[in-house]
Amino acid sequence: MNPPFESKYGCLTIVGNVLKNVPEHTKCAFILPDKKLEKDRKGPKLLKHSTLEKIIKLPEKVFSEGITTSIFIFEAGVPQNGKEVFACYIENDGLETVKNQGRQDIKDRWQAIEGEWIEIIRKQTGSDTIQWIEPSEHLSYQRHEKAFEISDEDFTKTMMDYLMFKEGIDVKEFGEKLLTKVL
């Protein structure tokens, strides 16, 4: 189910109603914004009556630019009780955006990729992107941040800029004076 992200009632109200009204042990899948369960106070409350079993983070460009989504799979009527949540990230689905046509499998890659991901999700193993999430800490896939790196050249330039600022030296004026002396 892909409930409206924002509307009069809110997507988590719709999710909650579905989970309450299907038979116990029914598997329910919802496409939601990545952090929706964490940012909305209703998110953690859903876990009192249903188990969030899996989070499948979708590729960045599935919807419009800047909207990142995941598939959240619940088992209705069974409380979470602290059980860890399986999560993975389908970083590349092989689809490409075609102007005025959306995302298309123009290079025929999806079939192979789909089979691989179905196995990974079913077995809950086989990908470096797999995480086991504590629901008391997070309710979304946690992307690893790349370590901050800076080159010696960038560090030197930044330090020079800072020292010139600290000493009150006008960079433009300094550059002009230096150029005049050299020429």
Range-by-range predicted roles:
Residues 3-183:
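A conserved structural/catalytic subdomain of Rossmann-like adenosyl-cofactor enzymes
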